[in-house]
């Protein structure tokens, strides 16, 4: 994978699609429009931006030997995963603690709560199956639920202690067709048939806001709560909100109300249902944890302490990179490493391995070993450890590296950019070998490309075509800018406005015009420069 090249291809493909779709009749309008959206600094796209971080700290052998769970992962957990296992364990009478997981992408947030909840379900059903939903996991999108369902199925199926003893159901509004949706657990699926879910009542319920709401309201779904609603010993002990940060504003209020209704319906006292939230990484402010805890308390209705927030722990850059040489080849060789139109991923990687690693056949593991000895890689990690940067920003911040500064002085900025792109491609290619024989990425590399909505484009009401983003309107500019329209049949374009029968002029308020257009009001007009006064 070449993330930077992929970002460019995505950008170019979108631009070409827009050009094929918006074929303006007027050449001056077409030229102005495409200059506007392709502008490097203020066009349709922002980026690409790069994020690069060292791996997470793993638990020690001694810590792995003392995980307070019987159902444990087959891999050495990260330090933050071990912390979650300890907080959520129910071993030896320990009460699971409210938990907020704020680790980064690729950190195994799901595994943080997956093994503790499987451990709980295993012990409930170890000798005789205890009826009732024991865990609810709520997702903001069905696609996320479906993806996690497959991972959950594989984990249960591959553990003989869980297979045929612990069940899970996907309750997201589908599953009515008995032929299409599975009624039993499998190696790559959980129970998805709605009737089977209601009949068997799975231990773990993967759902969304809408279906959990229906599950509490509708009589036909009341069988879901067998083992909880009519007994003092409640089976339900965990509720998980995936992507907790997405539940903001009115949606957050709705979810908070739903959780309180769930507790009321099942007569669950405060403190019995353990809340778990997964979230994006939090800010570095002194009150960031306190703010997150307050937010979680409002949503779950349970008490969260700052020590309940689990953050990531990454290997220090100097501990991860043992510099032997700077690693930057001669500028003339770097110029040979530019990505060509006829390159495949393999030919490109082989070429940069040849010039950067002096081994065109380097395996991902060998490449990783070499990169961890380069001073330029260490400096790149230091530059990117606190945030995301554009290629230009990375280039400017690498000036402290003597060889990189010399490369810039002796050649040009283009050569420096090629060098950065080569490094990122090598990092994406490289792997690290674990003690158990598995390989993982050498470092955590992300490339982000931001795209604006075309609906945010306004056109100034004037003869010469000129466009502006809605968010960039200058209050001191007396010119009027309105939403634009384009006709796919004839290529005509112009402005959208609104005028009531009682008005003597067209409306210039963008929000009013957009609302009228969306609601298909009859007072909406399409205007252009060819209209007669």
Predicted regions and their residues:
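Active-site cavity-forming subdomains of large catalytic enzyme subunits
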Residues: 243
């Amino acid at each position: 994978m070449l993330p930077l090249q992929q970002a460019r291809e995505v950008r170019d493909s979108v631009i070409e699609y827009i050009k094929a779709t918006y074929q303006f009749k007027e050449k001056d309008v077409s030229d102005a429009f495409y200059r506007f959206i392709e502008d490097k600094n203020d066009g349709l796209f922002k980026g690409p931006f790069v994020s690069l971080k060292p791996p997470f700290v793993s638990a020690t052998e001694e810590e792995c030997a003392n995980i307070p769970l019987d159902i444990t992962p087959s891999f050495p957990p990260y330090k933050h995963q071990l912390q979650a296992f300890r907080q959520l364990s129910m071993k030896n009478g320990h009460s699971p603690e409210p938990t907020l997981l704020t680790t980064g992408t690729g950190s195994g947030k799901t595994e943080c709560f997956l093994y503790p909840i499987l451990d709980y379900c295993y012990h409930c059903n170890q000798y005789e199956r205890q009826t009732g939903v024991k865990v609810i996991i709520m997702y903001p999108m069905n696609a996320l639920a479906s993806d996690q369902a497959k991972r959950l199925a594989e984990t249960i199926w591959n553990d003989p202690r869980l297979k045929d003893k612990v069940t899970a159901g996907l309750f997201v509004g589908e599953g009515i067709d008995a032929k299409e949706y599975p009624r039993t657990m499998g190696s790559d699926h959980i129970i998805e048939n709605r009737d089977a879910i209601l009949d068997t009542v799975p231990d773990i319920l993967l759902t969304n806001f809408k279906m959990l709401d229906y599950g509490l309201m509708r009589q036909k779904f009341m069988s879901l709560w067998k083992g909880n609603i009519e007994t003092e010993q409640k089976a339900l002990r965990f509720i998980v909100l995936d992507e907790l940060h997405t539940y903001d504003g009115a949606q957050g209020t709705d979810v908070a109300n739903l959780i309180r209704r769930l507790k009321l319906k099942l007569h669950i006292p405060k403190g019995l249902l353990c809340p778990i939230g997964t979230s994006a990484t939090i800010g570095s402010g002194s009150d960031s944890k306190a703010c997150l805890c307050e937010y979680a308390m409002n949503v779950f209705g349970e008490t969260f302490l700052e020590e309940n927030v689990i953050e990531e722990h990454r290997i220090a850059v100097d501990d991860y990179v043992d510099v032997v040489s700077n690693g930057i080849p001669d500028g003339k060789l770097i110029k040979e490493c530019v990505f060509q139109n006829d390159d495949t991923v393999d030919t490109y990687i082989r070429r940069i391995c040849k010039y950067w690693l002096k081994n065109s056949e380097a395996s991902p593991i060998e490449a990783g070993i070499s990169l961890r000895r380069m001073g330029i890689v260490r400096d790149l990690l230091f530059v990117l450890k606190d945030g995301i940067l554009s290629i230009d920003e990375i280039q400017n911040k690498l000036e402290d590296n003597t060889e990189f500064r010399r490369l810039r002085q002796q050649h040009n900025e283009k050569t420096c950019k090629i060098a950065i792109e080569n490094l990122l491609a090598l990092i994406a290619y490289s792997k690290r070998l674990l003690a158990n024989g598995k390989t993982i990425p050498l470092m955590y590399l992300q490339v982000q490309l931001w795209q604006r909505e075309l609906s945010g484009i306004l056109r100034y009401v004037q003869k010469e075509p000129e466009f502006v983003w809605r968010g960039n309107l200058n209050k001191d500019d007396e010119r009027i800018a309105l939403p634009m329209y384009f006709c796919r049949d004839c290529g005509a374009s112009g402005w959208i406005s609104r005028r009531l029968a009682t008005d003597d002029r067209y409306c210039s308020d963008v929000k009013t015009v957009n609302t009228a257009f969306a609601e298909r009001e009859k007072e909406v007009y399409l205007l252009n420069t060819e209209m007669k006064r």
